[in-house]
């Protein structure tokens, strides 16, 4: 399916920020070419992204609680050239304190920071108790990206703690996408 219109409607950043980001990405690509430990740089027209997933099944990982990091290269004719090299990190369904434990949170934050993403997207279902929201959001706020952090609510978030999550996300400068596009 053609998702170009959806993507451009969902995330339309300030083009001046995007130009600066594009310059930074070109510098990163040059460094990648020089480094023998990296794969070849991403080809033109490809926007790399990062998907970080978690489940309660134990799988060997550098970071406790993180089962896998999946990287995708995305190309589409409607994605502007300015997004060449743009990196998106996505997390979802942490269910903090139920599936995802406190001891795993520091590892997740370090992993997200190591991805050097341009934007962090959060897909909801953050918690399993309102008392855990401040701790979780404060930890995720340590992940700084040039284009910011954007989050939506999951079904569990609407059932409880909805206002707590919104308040904490806004407190740390995160953008809550609720029935709107930015």
What residue ranges belong to the model's regions?
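Membrane-embedded segments
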Residues: 65-68, 79-167, 172-175
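Short loop/edge segments at beta-strand edges and connector loops
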Residues: 178-180
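Acidic, histidine-bearing metal-coordination/catalytic regions of metal-dependent phosphoesterases
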Residues: 1-87
